[in-house]
Amino acid sequence: MSNKAVIILSGGMDSVTTLALAKDRGYDCYTLSFNYGQKSISELDAALYYSKKYHCIKHKVFDINFGDFTDSALTNSSTSVLDNSEASIPKTYVPMRNIIFLSIACSWAENINSTNIFIGANAIDYSGYPDCREEFLDSFEKMINLGSKTGSEGKIFNIHRPLVEMSKIRTKWIDTPGKNTKLIKPASINEVKNDD
């Protein structure tokens, strides 16, 4: 079994915590970030910073501009997060984002002979984003195992989601219990830019 894992790393608190947990579990981590036209582009600096801080094998940034075809508050400067009112799906929802991110992560994982993908979906995301739900992640895992060379060869992709049952508050204070790494608390973007 390969000890490699692809970590979807936005640079935010959840994905950095997920990276720390993967490292603590002994995985050789390959981090994957996405430049999808998001307003919080500075998180990509944080993703690179934490990839280096955790001694990841490789860090890649994949460019895809969701802003060309969606009006999510995360990608469209004219859409406000505050415009959400009573909507069940938040204005920050980017259509099919995790489907695309997970597909690309699985493609890279297959290329490096890995079956482990980590995503930092959590309980807060679960409440509003359809592609952060446990049911979605279970179904995606089944689908990717049916539609990949890896699955056809009898190996099983595992979509690890260690934070799916946690709130952001709990995630903020989680401490990795193992000996492989000490969780580095996510820093402010200014600290990231000023630290070598």
Language-model segment annotations:
Residues 1-177:
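ATP-dependent adenylation/nucleotidyltransferase module used to activate substrates
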Residues 183-196:
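Cysteine-cluster motifs in flexible loop/terminal segments that predominantly coordinate metals
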